[in-house]
């Protein structure tokens, strides 16, 4: 079955609404990427609307860390997933989303990019 991002045809009271047109192709979606911390990087290139390409990060090893007081960015290895505010179960499964806090060689880093959309992990170093 397809992932549909359109209206669910229910009124706020729970009653059914009638459909005034068919479903459109632009209302289709895709399942979430669910980027994981791993020992080997993996990306997936998919074709999106308009013939463009989107890179999805399936497995991540490194993160680009911005150090605020030094004003530079360094690529560093991820050691573990510490916390995921959006879903506590994600930290146990080593899933990485935007807002996830990971431990790196430099310290704790908060992920600022969307790995399923951008294809890269960017983050900012948290102060101690």
Swiss-Prot record:
Basic residues: bias regions: 13-27
Protein name, as recorded: Small ribosomal subunit protein eS8
CDD domains from the UniProt entry: Ribosomal_S8e (cd11382)
The gene coding this protein: rps8e
NCBIfam families named in the record: eS8
Family matches, as InterPro entries: Ribosomal_eS8 (IPR001047), Ribosomal_eS8_CS (IPR018283), Ribosomal_protein_eS8_arc (IPR020919), Ribosomal_Se8/biogenesis_NSA2 (IPR022309)
UniProt keyword Manganese, yes or no: no
Protein origin, superkingdom: Archaea
Swiss-Prot/TrEMBL keywords: Ribonucleoprotein, Ribosomal protein
Stated family: Belongs to the eukaryotic ribosomal protein eS8 family.
